[in-house]
């Protein structure tokens, strides 16, 4: 079980990313645009650097929805590999069966 503070911090980061997503995308588009002038591109890069650090989607961590485990998370289920295995064995994941051959 992850610390509650780590889970809460990650949720806060998700909100910050969502809040700044449109502005960030616009600035990135301007910063790499060939048609924009060099000064305009430099200003866009500077404005991009001024955004909060947590506005970058890279800072959001995929965590287990059940207990917040940060590693080994399967995106398809939103759960950690350990939790997926436990739930699959218990028959709690529809359509998932233990393979045997």
Curated annotation (Swiss-Prot):
Binds 16S rRNA, required for the assembly of 30S particles and may also be responsible for determining the conformation of the 16S rRNA at the A site. SUPFAM superfamilies: Glucocorticoid receptor-like (DNA-binding domain) (SSF57716). It comes from Kineococcus radiotolerans (strain ATCC BAA-149 / DSM 14245 / SRS30216). One of its GO terms (biological process) is translation. Transmembrane segments: none annotated. It comes from the Bacteria. This is Small ribosomal subunit protein uS14A. Residues 1-21, 49-73 are annotated as: Disordered. GO terms for cellular component: small ribosomal subunit. InterPro entries: Ribosomal_uS14 (IPR001209), Ribosomal_uS14_bac/plastid (IPR023036). Belongs to the universal ribosomal protein uS14 family. One of its GO terms (molecular function) is structural constituent of ribosome. Part of the 30S ribosomal subunit. Contacts proteins S3 and S10. Residues 8-21, 61-70 have a biased composition (Basic and acidic residues).
